[in-house]
């Protein structure tokens, strides 16, 4: 599980975001991320990589 406060990079476009919330759903973790443009989106960890 990735922790709240972790910096991540979206794999497809390189956008940087900050993990704001972690929700467990049916045994899988969903991450709410605040992206560099100020938007919030949820996604699974396969769509981003941890950078710090």
Where are these regions (language model features)?
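Basic/aromatic-rich interaction segments and small domains that mediate binding to polyanionic partners
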Residues: 3-52
């Amino acid at each position: 599980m990735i922790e709240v406060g972790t910096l991540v990079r979206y794999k497809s476009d390189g956008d940087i975001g900050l993990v704001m919330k972690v929700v467990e759903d049916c045994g899988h973790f969903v991450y709410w991320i605040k992206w560099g443009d100020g938007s919030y989106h949820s996604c699974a960890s396969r769509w981003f990589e941890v950078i710090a």
